Amino acid sequence: MNRFRILLCPLLAVALAGSAPVAHAAERKTLRYALEIAETGFDPVEIYDIYSRDIVANIFDAPLRFAYLAAPGTVEPSTADGMPEMSSDYKTFTFHIKQGIYFTDDPAFQGKRRELTAADYVYSYKRIFDPHWNSPIYENFETFGVLGMQSLREAALKSGHFDYDQPVEGLKTLDRYTFQFRLSTPSPRFLQNFADASLMGAVAREVVEKYGEGIMAHPVGTGPFRLVEWHRSSSMVLERNPDYRNDIFHVTPDPSDPGAQEIARELDGKRLPLIDRVEISIIEESQPRWLSFLNGEADFLDVMPRDMADLALPNGKPAPNLVRKHIQVERVPQIDVTVALYNMDNPVIGGYSPQRVALRRAINLGFDTAEIIRTYYKFQAFPAQAISMPGVYGYDPKLRTENGLTSVARAKALLDQYGYVPRHGTRWRDNPDGSPLVIEISTEPDQRSRIWDEIYQKTLDALDIHCRFKVAKFPDQFKAARAGSYMSWSLGESATGPDPSDTLRMGYGPAAGADNLSRFKLAAYDEMYLKQNQIPDGPERLQLLRQMNALLIAYAPMKFIAHRYVIDMAYPWVRYYRHWPFVRADFWRYVDIDQGLKARTLRH
């Protein structure tokens, strides 16, 4: 992976420890930063957006986790007592949970300490299948074919009641600290799903039953932090969980990364988390978020606003004001792809007829990706050729496809060929049946979105296609997209692990309204998706991945636009931070705040 790290101070962040005095015990180490989009809540089975998941990943604990500073994609035990046992046919997985792990105190436990048990993971998994919660991640797990789970869900759909106490053949507690999954089909990469606490964090049944529909506002977990303040869409405060387990850092660092090796040596043997408090603000506009960081109101900048790139990194080098403040800068390829979605159920832009396919492919050809990267991303992105993401299995950096092309002439010829021509004396094209062709674009009310809107409108104007915009905040647009109440909307898709299956679900028919927001449904694609999910990595799987990419490009339910670079910044007193693959918000537990250095720096 192409990665560079700029340390503007001549001393490496980890080396600052030796010169810094120990902070007074009464001083709480606090990490402050801002998110660009508001959270939606904190219930693992109800949330989908990465901003909420970033918070949830620090409150709850999954059995496994991706290892910080290890070779990207390495999985290690978290609450699990060793790695789970996997059968040779990839159908049976047995987890053993460490004893003596406790949930944070909550009135739901009636004053008693509540130990984490295997039953909590079984209950949490079953919640995904409970129709009452309408979980957006249900389809992710339905495809694994856990024996008996689908029957339990279907019974609940008929009766209106989900029976959590009903025994399930494929999901059992073998004893207080052991649970087992049995699948109907092989799943070689099944364990990776249990390395994401925002998906598979354990939730206590008593808490869900106490708070009911209010569970989104009452997260109670076993993770390193707990939520102590929440002002919806404005700010959050999390503090160290006083009941957190004895979590000692030890990892074999990535042998190809000297910086990771140095930090790993410094962290080795330390008890996590290292900080006491995390304060998060929601600042949606780029410039205020950038100025908040420059003014010292935040210690860390999570993804520098790309429209500030010219100011922050002129000619690719840190600006003098950043150098003077000894700010750490890290720029790495983000494991993501940005997409323009088309609702395949929409009567104007959706459908599988040659005319509708031609319309979507023409719009895709009209996108000026170079202009998008220059104007919108400020050169902090590179063109996407397909759904495959850098850093994920199957990504081919040499691949070139129609998706990566820009040709207004070809796009216009395609529209002409399939009957999208002006019929009413204006420049604007009409549908083949003569009705007006208008593309409705969903967007958000912030400055960055307005820049994107101008590019999208310029694309359609060049094709003589009329458009209008539907403006609402991200959570509302997301709800509308899940319900299929939109025509076109753009967003980014990030990978949660090295397996491409989750990303490929963007085109998987049964996931329509969840991962598959375009609502694309094609039997051939669905069959390939299931097959690739059941076989080990190798030539056969790679061929299936290539064929699935080709189908998405041919039918064009979406346009794959770009893979972004992420630029993170931190003041020199933030120690041990690296933007590590698949370890996103989980980094809280690994970073430290050098109170002495911070005090000395702010005095000058």
In which residue ranges do the predicted regions lie?
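Bacterial N-terminal signal peptides
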Residues: C9-G18
